[in-house]
Amino acid sequence: MPFQQREQNGLVWFTADVLNQIPHGFSTRMGGVPPAPWDSLNLRPNQGDGPEALRENYRRFFAVLGLDEHRTVLSQQTHTANIRRVTAADAGKGVVRPRDYTDVDALITNEAALPLTVFSADCGTVLLYDPVRQAVGAAHAGWRGCAAGIVEKTVQAMEDAYGSRPADLLAALGPCIGRCCFETDGDVPAAMRDALGADAEPHMERRGVKFHVDLAGLNRQWLLRAGLAPEHIEVSGVCTACRPDLFWSHRKMGDQRGVQAAVIALKECL
């Protein structure tokens, strides 16, 4: 299986085989400390369960990934297609010191031991790795970001900043709401058609007066359009809305819920 479900000390997370050369992971809601309704591994800053519980949740998740949570850099998501190039000067922003940026839904870096963190609770997350140029990226790609082309723009940003070639990139698309549960009105399919044209059609279907949309499939389509090889892309295939016992889901829980995190980092040279 391209994605692996892992468990350690009650904490459950997913990894992708395509990224097995570097530290990375997609968290679930299992293995943290807060009480309901934030139980238990909520990684959402400034939401619900207090700073001490949040710090402990970060410590636990980053420990199983073999990473230092004090050096991670958090996105500041507003469903845009904005991308931030991260350097050591950003280390810890969002965790141990305030973020001095807003409207950032994707992060890229070519510096080691500088974990990039993006969030979701049904939206898509995409982790990227360039094993040739040694660079990584992380993108939050909900339907608005997908329609705005954030995945392709993140690939382009890595190409512009680090000389990455799309054919070299490896990508993992984490758990997100599936076609089974992502029921929408016509505005979402219309936005996808405007962005992807006929390539969007296989990932959407009409059921009565509503539409069902395959968000992961659409984000994968953007990766293919950007030039990634199909064999370099892995999709979890897990629907967050189908598994509210395992994942935070905005569709199932509304605003009273936490978030998952998707994290990626380059190894530190010893």
Q: What do the PLM-derived regions correspond to, one by one?
A:
Residues M1-L270:
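Active-site microenvironment for binding and transforming phosphate-containing groups
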